Amino acid sequence: METMMLAALPLLFLSSCFPAFVVAQGPADPRLTGTWTTKSMKVFTGSAFYDPIKDRLKEPLLTGISYSFTADGFYEEAYFRAISNPTRPECPSGIMQFQHGTYRVEPNGSMILTPFDSDGRQLISNRCAGKYAEYTRYTQKEVFQRYEILIDSYNRVERLNMFQFDGSPLNPMYLAFRQPQMHPTHTLNPTHTTKGAPRATAISERKVNAKRAKRSEEKAAEFGFAQSPLSKNSFVKRMNYYHSRMEKLSGTDKLWWVGLIMTSVGSLALIYR
């Protein structure tokens, strides 16, 4: 017994020197393996969408959705969506979301995606709301009622149809890479908490809050789109309908004002004739 315990000590020491890796739970579907993206073909998972070192989301040229899956039960997702504003068409909003974690396929055909808690990120951007976008942590477990993989009759490539928990479909995605384009399948930005640590005093709390505020300002300056929160080369293309509508409206307004002024000038000329 003592010999076995001594033999196990080096293994315990080595295991403490390396970070813990997550093992995917539940069955995976090898047919899902790869990177899938929607029709715009501009949104892909991986380093092109999220930089974990700088903790920064990178805005693609066009909106879209991308999912990647591995054969051993890991996934990653990238969302870039435009949201119209019916009351102010010139002020559309944009949402970017990044998550990764594990997935499993249930016996009934449903699929459950469980993200790593500390890694999800969300960016909400509104050109009319302020100087900077809102950048926060984001964690949302997803349940898909079912999914199907088939050959698209038009593009002749593999297509992935995913149906949300209520049966509503996501936009169809097409296989872009058989080798998944994604980050390492473990937590990228862990949050460290110490149990039993003494509570900070009021002074130290103020110092921490001041440092956090300074970091937030630095992060906003670096990442918060010092220029317009929504770039012209993505949302303007996506929201052409609303922009053209506003342009037509402004042109009509101008024409109306010009007509009113000319009518007024003509009336005055007749009066003083």
Curated annotation (Swiss-Prot):
Glycosylation sites: 108
Gene Ontology CC annotation, any one: endoplasmic reticulum membrane
Keywords: Endoplasmic reticulum, Glycoprotein, Membrane, Signal, Transmembrane, Transmembrane helix
Transmembrane segments: 251-271
GO terms of molecular function: unfolded protein binding
Record GO biological process: 'de novo' protein folding
Function: Required for normal levels of the cell wall 1,6-beta-glucan. Involved in a protein folding machinery chaperoning proteins acting in various physiological processes including cell wall synthesis and lysis of autophagic bodies.
Protein name: Protein ROT1
Source species: Ajellomyces capsulatus (strain NAm1 / WU24)
Organism phylogeny: Eukaryota, Fungi, Dikarya, Ascomycota, Pezizomycotina
